[in-house]
Amino acid sequence: MYPFRGLPVRFDTFHTIFRAFQYRNYRYYYYGQSISLIGVWVQNIAMGWLVYRLTGSALLLGTIAFSLQIPSLFITPFAGVLADRWDRRKVIVVTQILSMVVAFVLAWLTLTERITVGMIISLALVNGVVLAFDTPFRQSFVPDIITRREDLSNAIALNSSLYNLARFIGPPVGGVLIALVGEGWCFFINGVSFAAVIIALASMRIKKIRRPPRFGSVFSQLREGVGYAWHFRSIRYLITLVALSSFFGLPFQALMPLFAAEILGGDSQMLGILTGALGAGALTGAFFLASRKNIRSIPGIALRASLMFALGLSVFALSAYTALSVLALVVTGFGMIVHFNSTNTLIQSIADDDKRGRVVSLYSLTFMGITPLGSLLAGAIAEYISVPFTVFAFSLVCLASAILFGKRVKTVYTSLVRKMATGP
């Protein structure tokens, strides 16, 4: 039931880290995603390389990334309302089928040499719309397949580790496939990979969840969800922390090529080293969070991780030495993934089940939707005060928000304990 059985490591350690695997439905979900996410990263690399090969334009590369992310800002909140109304598993199946269709269309256009940059941007935008709709359903679906609330943090952390593993595996595989068979077949392979998660979802046995009848329009339900999150102090504190960390903390990733080339005097290999260091820290953080048995420790972990993220980022911003930059990024990656995953766990653990989809959509909006806006602001400011000082200034905002959250963490802990005592 648990991976890595037979290795010379204490079995109870793996039992703790992979305890969400005791749920049959979660195992299916995890294995299906593992194949699909690698395919997604293969497609991401191939799409970027295809645009670069056709145009050589950094601006158009940025436009592709913007097209993938910006729909979240407008669609995700409304998708969260529907996630509280509709069957989450069925909707996820539909979004995976739509993503599969986009991949196959990309493959056909590329293999027949009909592809243009405008088509790539349009299909990236379609993919972004599907992703924006899919995210609240996907995130609020995990508690549906995890019976015990105390195992929820483990399931969310394992999902994060899977994402980071795919980020490690997918790009190198994509690079090899581009060299061997070209971008078109990379898109085709990604389309096929979606079959894994579709089959996994179809194979699950889930008890029908009775949802209370909904009255009023989507807008009124959205307003109710926003009001609920705002007046629930613990959720308001958590979402505010995530919003500030996303807007001011995450844009540094878009500026990494400039750090590699202009600050450290490197090339694409240096960028790979920096990205790998960030990913190594993130992967370590995901497994660290998965190993935590007591969910009551998560509020304190969230606070310490947000401080670690801000401090690591500030050191990286001012570093002119490769070794120090790599070390700072490992710390930053660890703090980043533990910070965002632990706040996600807390939000899902303390929110009422009938409002979880809408609350998770607000988390997704602050985590994904506003980051492109922060990146635009960071790029504009960097033109005047330099990239390092921009990132350093942004890291100080993250540090201040973490310190302020520290004054509210007891409220979050109390909400969690109360929810654990009363149940769903």
Locations of the language-model features?
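Hydrophobic core of transmembrane alpha-helices in multi-pass small-molecule transporters
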Residues: 34, 115-133, 243, 312, ...
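Loop-to-transmembrane helix entry/capping segments in MFS-fold secondary transporters
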Residues: 58-59, 149-159, 268-269, 353-362
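Cytoplasmic helix-loop-helix junction between adjacent transmembrane helices
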Residues: 123-165
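Helix-loop junctions on the cytosolic side of multi-pass membrane transporters
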Residues: 140, 144, 183, 187-217, ...
